[in-house]
């Protein structure tokens, strides 16, 4: 069963509203994790064993694979982009993006992986999010998340 695009897109403004307000952090994480769990139930997400399968299963959770293309697989990492226009785009609110992407981190937990946003649409001039996925048991210490990089004042990914 496909998640209807209209339903998926209706969730985005609610997610942005919560994630844009740091004082709502107590509610944002459970909300995003709950929405991800609901998506996983509707789409019948299954744990995967290889990093390629993890990337493909993450893609399958969206209304269209075209909006979340896998751009490459290197060693233990799947790279992908998120082409859905984010309301955080260009705002500089990379922390809000991080809170909102709890949705994807929860999905990756359920399918056996980890999720890191490398570049966020919230950063000035960035039009697509660049993300990385690895199996749950593979360290991600070498991947610098966008919100950490932005906090350091470095807007160029490593």
Descriptions of predicted regions:
Residues 1-79, 83-103, 114-158:
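N-terminal accessory segment detector
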């Amino acid at each position: 069963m496909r998640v209807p695009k209209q339903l998926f897109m209706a969730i985005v403004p609610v997610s942005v509203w919560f994630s844009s307000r740091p004082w709502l952090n107590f509610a944002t994480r459970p909300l995003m994790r709950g929405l991800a769990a609901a998506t996983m139930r509707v789409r019948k997400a299954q744990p995967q064993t290889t990093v390629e399968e993890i990337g493909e299963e993450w893609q399958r959770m969206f209304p269209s694979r075209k909006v979340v293309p896998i751009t490459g697989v290197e060693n233990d990492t799947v790279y992908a982009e998120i082409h859905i226009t984010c309301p955080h785009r260009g705002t500089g609110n990379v922390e809000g993006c991080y809170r909102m992407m709890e949705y994807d981190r929860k999905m990756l937990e359920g399918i056996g992986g980890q999720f890191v946003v490398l570049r966020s649409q919230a950063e000035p001039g960035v039009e697509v999010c660049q993300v990385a996925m690895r199996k749950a048991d593979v360290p991600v210490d070498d991947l610098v998340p966008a919100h950490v990089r932005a906090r350091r004042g470095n807007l160029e990914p490593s």
